[in-house]
Amino acid sequence: MNFAIIFSGQGLQNLAHVHELRSMAKELQVVDELELYLPKLFYSDLTEADLYPNEFAQPFIFALQWCRWQKLKPEIGDLMSFSGYSLGELSALICATQIGLEQGLYLAQQRASLMSSAAQDASGLIAVQGINLNTLEPLLTETSTSLSIKLSDSSFVVGGADANLQQLVQQLELRGTRFVKRLNVTIASHTVWMDAAVQPYQQVLQQQDFARLCTAMISGSGGHKFFKTTDAVNALIHQMNHAIDWDACLTVIQENQPDMVLEIGPGSALSKMLLERNPNCLVRAVDDFKSWSGLQAWLDKQSRI
C-alpha cells in the first residue's frame, strides 16, 4: 500500500498528548532533548491552558509528530507523499529530510519565537464557515483582518488583532454566518502580521544542512508537489506571512490517489475534511485509535486486504 501522510497544525492538542509524548520520549530515548527545549512538558501541574501559547505549542506539537512518525515508519509500506498544515509543514519537511529531534526542536522553537515577536499586539485566528470568499473579503478589508487559510470554497481561517477579530465576528453574526469560532492559537499566522518573522527565519533555515527529501512533499501552502529540498524550504518560508490554500493541497493529494491517507495529528480535523470531500477514500488519524497496538493492528489488517 502507498501512503500519504498529513501533519496537523495547532489548536487540537490536549493533555492526553502530553502523557503520550512523555511515554514516547522514554521509549525513543529522547527525554534529554525534550527537557532541554520543552522543560515545561515535565511539570506536574501542567494544565490544558498551558498547551496553547505559541512558544510552547509549536515545539510541543512538532515533538509529538516527530515521535509518532518514528514509531509509524516501520509500519508504513510505500510512502507516496508528506503534507503539512501550517506548523505541520515544518514537521513534514523535518521528517522528509530525516532530521533528528534536537535540530527539529530548535527549528520549531525559532519559528515560534520569531512569530511571537512579530505579533506585537494580542492577536489570533478565527474559523469561519458558510460564507464565500467574495462576500468575506470586503469584511476583512473593513475590519483590518486577513485571510490566513482557505479550507474550502465556504470555509476559511482568518487572522488579525483581537479587537479587529471581534469586530469581524460581530459583522459575520449580523449576516447570519453559519459558524464562527475563535481558535486556540495566539498569533495571526500566515498573514501580514508575521512579516517581521520572515527574514530572520529564512536565515535560520539557510544555516541548516538539509538532506534530500526521502519522499515527495505536497505543499500545504498551495498543493505544489516538491521533489527538491530547496523548493520545500522556500515554501515553508513563504507561508509564514502568506495565506495557505489547504483546499488546493487536499485536491492534489486526492489526484495522486494514495491507497491510504494517515493524519499524524494532533486531532483528526484534516482527515475528516478529506473524508467529506471523498467518502470512498481510506483516511484515518492516529488520534482515531485508543492505543498504538490498535493502530498497528488496523494497519496490518489493511495491508492484507
Predicted regions and their residues:
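Gly/Ser/Thr-rich beta-alpha loop segments that engage phosphate groups in nucleotides
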Residues: 10-13, 86, 90, 162, ...
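Patatin-like phospholipase
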Residues: 30-41, 63-131, 136
